[in-house]
Amino acid sequence: MAENSVLTSTTGRTSLADSSIFDSKVTEISKENLLIGSTSYVEEEMPQIETRVILVQEAGKQEELIKALKTIKIMEVPVIKIKESCPGKSDEKLIKSVINMDIKVGFVKMESVEEFEGLDSPEFENVFVVTDFQDSVFNDLYKADCRVIGPPVVLNCSQKGEPLPFSCRPLYCTSMMNLVLCFTGFRKKEELVRLVTLVHHMGGVIRKDFNSKVTHLVANCTQGEKFRVAVSLGTPIMKPEWIYKAWERRNEQDFYAAVDDFRNEFKVPPFQDCILSFLGFSDEEKTNMEEMTEMQGGKYLPLGDERCTHLVVEENIVKDLPFEPSKKLYVVKQEWFWGSIQMDARAGETMYLYEKANTPELKKSVSMLSLNTPNSNRKRRRLKETLAQLSRETDVSPFPPRKRPSAEHSLSIGSLLDISNTPESSINYGDTPKSCTKSSKSSTPVPSKQSARWQVAKELYQTESNYVNILATIIQLFQVPLEEEGQRGGPILAPEEIKTIFGSIPDIFDVHTKIKDDLEDLIVNWDESKSIGDIFLKYSKDLVKTYPPFVNFFEMSKETIIKCEKQKPRFHAFLKINQAKPECGRQSLVELLIRPVQRLPSVALLLNDLKKHTADENPDKSTLEKAIGSLKEVMTHINEDKRKTEAQKQIFDVVYEVDGCPANLLSSHRSLVQRVETISLGEHPCDRGEQVTLFLFNDCLEIARKRHKVIGTFRSPHGQTRPPASLKHIHLMPLSQIKKVLDIRETEDCHNAFALLVRPPTEQANVLLSFQMTSDELPKENWLKMLCRHVANTICKADAENLIYTADPESFEVNTKDMDSTLSRASRAIKKTSKKVTRAFSFSKTPKRALRRALMTSHGSVEGRSPSSNDKHVMSRLSSTSSLAGIPSPSLVSLPSFFERRSHTLSRSTTHLI
């Protein structure tokens, strides 16, 4: 191919390019400097050549490979067009390009290089497919400068419908295609050459110098300029094992080395090659940081060990080092430690070096505060100026004093309405109001005589301003950075986790910013007749909208923070970094997020205090009462919504526990009343002896049986695993379908039994469902009363007691004898197996005559009574029980096919449940 024929024309010359022309020294990367050209000029000027694919040795025996080659009709061919710049001048311009050409010869099989002729013939463009890039055949082809590809390239092109690619180097697979790598820290040339070769075989590109085009840095150490630049640019820094493991998976289709799940296993951890020690931390914090050090690839040693590379210092506590550090030891602040974990790379130490807190001016000022009383006016004046300077330099934090952890845990959201009228119980905020959104319009004017009403109004404004600052801190320091795109090391939290944590905080911030601005206008232009109550009435609807969603889900927000902090080290580091900032007042995110929970009761206290100091003739007196009422209404909504939220959570638990539970069980008006564990005593709603769970809701009854075989765990897209569903849905029954509740008398053969007489709307007969309660926690009498009360509420009847009837077990052929015996369990298992075979032809026996006799005979053992009445015979029993029969049909209790199936399609009558 070195002496390819050239066709000359007046416009230029075109040559089939020798692969050597596209050597790495010329093009650096295979396709970056190539233009995908059209074949228009080639058809006119290119000599006719023949493209062909040659399967070498084992490649010719792979049926999958041969089948894939038959679907590929095109390959890329490199060409060089030689174009003269001007006629008569010797200057020539080389235009390199890659064109697509048809594969005229499908494929040729070859056993050895020697037997194949025409390797260098200009009449052919040959592509050799080799299965092993380590054997002698590959080496011979490589030395002959032939185009060599691996089977994965062919399979990939066939799958995607792409032409066979051109590469100036042997290309086994495309698992590193479009990746640009740079290496640092390698001292053994042989290892570096091996890694570079593998990258080229997988389609990757190598850069000697680090620049913005480099996608990955492969590092053998954590020092050097390339490492620091990669950290600053957020470029992933990888171990050499990443390349080796990717090469091991070279034959896998659809594998790509840059996929996060694979790549993250081989990222250089932040503390690789680092040995840390810690100073100034509590035992608990130190233990936590030592565990994080090992987790992030580092080691730790006791303080003062000469082998340590870094000393991490708690700069807020440590004022002086206990020893003189060596020149090789980095003494850094704790922010370096947490920052490295957050960015998932070792941060530069120079930005976080620990320095002693030297404040000579302050020391000089404080030194003047001696025990000796100044004897001159000059000393007194200097002392006064020093104290004034200290007071000006002291930044009063807008945050209240930090509470004990026990105080936080003792807070109950449900106690929001428990508002004391003592102003001493309100939080003592700082005296200097600050605003994160804008500065105050003017300094607060002080009336000549400060009234108590003005003092309380000023405190209300100050606390509101501080509260807005706290909300702004939450948003600016926590929420906004977490939501930013292009975070170094990838997103710290998933979007749904961020939404769960912060909820409606931005909406709360917007409302209170407006309230603060209105209060500021009122304070600046103070007048006793100005109405403060109008401000809160103005935004009462906004408060109702924004607060309940956040306060009701605060516990969920708190749990999400704790869970993510344990599972995600970068999030833990992010919280630690921000907690150390002065804006947070050394408080955690959970402690800051609890402020909205506390704010409304605090405002109500101040408004109550303001009302006390407002004259009766002042119009704001009545307005304040309305404002306090509106705040209580908001807190009432919070408590009601909290109860609704808990009720909805219970329904969700039922849905997850019951496999196949209908979706229409979820409804805003529905709540779970009681759960009862029972055993089925009849053939319906499931086989006798089956464990059945009844979920009583305020308007329906969910019937579920215990699963015979537990299904696999449910895994959400976010990796959280739910317990497997332990129950199987049978039927969701509206309470309106329950016509009577039968209290079965206690006998030797029947204990704790009851029955339900139901009328499905799609059937012409009543159905008897009998159960035995298995738990003694809830007495049967209480359960039946509860059930009848909700049935009566559903059908809009006041006489719930009339729904209960007492009956003898013999009348309905109900007994609980031997329910748990081995023989009974074996019998049920045999019966269940036989039903699977003959279900289509089986006709279950029914207690037809027994139930007819119990319901239709004028004298029997059934006595209609209320739960509170004494048992006695009722002579007019036929008339009293006629409602049980419904339709006087001989097939009154024929068991319908409605309960023959183990799961049912919802009937039309259940649509009202939605």
UniProtKB/Swiss-Prot annotation:
Changing T373A: Does not inhibit its Rho exchange activity. Increases interaction with RACGAP1. Does not inhibit anchorage-independent growth and invasion in cancer cells. Residues 418-429 have a biased composition (Polar residues). Induction: Up-regulated by calcium in cells forming cell-cell contact sites. Up-regulated by DNA damaging agents like H(2)O(2) or ionizing radiation (IR). Changing F652A: No effect on GEF activity but severely decreases ECT2 activation by RHOA. Localizes correctly but fails to rescue the cytokinesis defect caused by knockdown of endogenous ECT2 in contrast to the wild-type protein which rescues this defect. Residues 452-641 form the DH domain. Residues 675-794 form the PH domain. The modification N-acetylalanine is found at A2. GO terms for biological process: activation of GTPase activity; activation of protein kinase activity; bicellular tight junction assembly; cell differentiation; cell morphogenesis; cellular response to calcium ion; cellular response to hydrogen peroxide; cellular response to ionizing radiation. Phosphorylated by PLK1 in vitro. Hyperphosphorylated during the G2 phase of the cell cycle. Phosphorylation at Thr-373 occurs during the G2/M phase, relieves its auto-inhibition status and stimulates its GEF activity. Phosphorylation at Thr-444 in G2/M phase is required for subsequent binding with PLK1 and Rho exchange activation. Dephosphorylated at the time of cytokinesis. Phosphorylation at Thr-359 is required for its transformation activity in cancer cells. The keyword Cell membrane does not apply. PROSITE patterns: BRCT, DH_1, DH_2. The modification Phosphothreonine is found at T359, T373, T444, T846. Keywords: Acetylation, Cell cycle, Cell division, Cell junction, Cytoplasm, Cytoskeleton, Differentiation, Guanine-nucleotide releasing factor, Isopeptide bond, Neurogenesis, Nucleus, Oncogene, Phosphoprotein, Protein transport, Repeat, Tight junction, Transport, Ubl conjugation. Residues 171-260, 266-354 form the BRCT domain. This is Protein ECT2. It comes from Homo sapiens (Human). The lineage of its organism: Eukaryota, Metazoa, Chordata, Craniata, Vertebrata. The gene is ECT2.
